[in-house]
């Protein structure tokens, strides 16, 4: 009767995989992963601070936090959007519009970027762009979105074919 070697081979394979994994982790180049984790932690912390400052209407502080987030991760559309809303709060509609547009270049379905782009465009007197961005927002937003009714009201208000008496 032959001895079944499959179990021994399986255990030897698993041990070899574990050993190779351990060696990879211990390589000199493994340090950046720890740095990436620290970087991610700072991004999360700064983003949360920015959101808190945004809600507290401390727009300058919020913008500073979002600028730091973008320095660490320039491809984060949420940070672009929130920087845009901070700039709107500071009365800087043109700069805000640029941040909303950058967010949409990174992620075309970033809904709050369309909303912010519409508000910024309206403040700049570009009602055609405001209507376009708000229509996109209203089209993509779920029915239960808390800002959808505001978007529909803005579209009604901005409609050039409706007489507002």
PLM regions and their residue ranges:
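Terminal, low-structured helical/coil segments at or just beyond the last alpha-helical repeat
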Residues: 3-11, 19-35, 131-165
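Repeat-mediated protein-protein interaction surfaces in helical alpha-solenoids
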Residues: 19-37, 60-68, 96-98
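Alpha-helical segment of the N-proximal tetratricopeptide repeat
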Residues: 36-72
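Helix-start (N-cap) detector for alpha-helical repeat units in TPR-like alpha-solenoids
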Residues: 43, 77-78, 111-112, 145-146
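Canonical tetratricopeptide repeat
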Residues: 48, 82, 116, 150-154
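Structural signature of tandem alpha-helical TPR/SEL1-like repeats
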Residues: 55-68, 89-102, 124-136, 148, ...
């Amino acid at each position: 009767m032959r001895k079944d070697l499959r179990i021994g081979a399986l255990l030897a394979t698993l041990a070899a995989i574990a050993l190779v994994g351990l060696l990879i982790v211990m390589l000199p180049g493994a340090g950046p992963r720890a740095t990436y984790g620290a970087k991610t932690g700072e991004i999360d912390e700064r983003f949360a601070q920015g959101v808190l400052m945004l809600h507290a209407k401390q727009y300058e502080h919020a913008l500073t936090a979002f600028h730091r987030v973008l320095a660490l991760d320039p491809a984060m559309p949420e940070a672009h959007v929130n920087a845009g809303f901070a700039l709107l709060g500071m009365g800087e509609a043109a700069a805000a519009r640029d941040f909303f547009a950058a967010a949409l270049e990174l992620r075309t379905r970033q809904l709050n970027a369309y909303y912010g782009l519409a508000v910024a465009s309206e403040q700049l007197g570009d009602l055609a762009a405001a209507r376009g961005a708000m229509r996109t927002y209203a089209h993509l937003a779920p029915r239960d979105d808390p800002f959808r009714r505001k978007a529909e009201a803005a579209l009604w208000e901005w409609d050039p074919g409706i007489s507002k008496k």
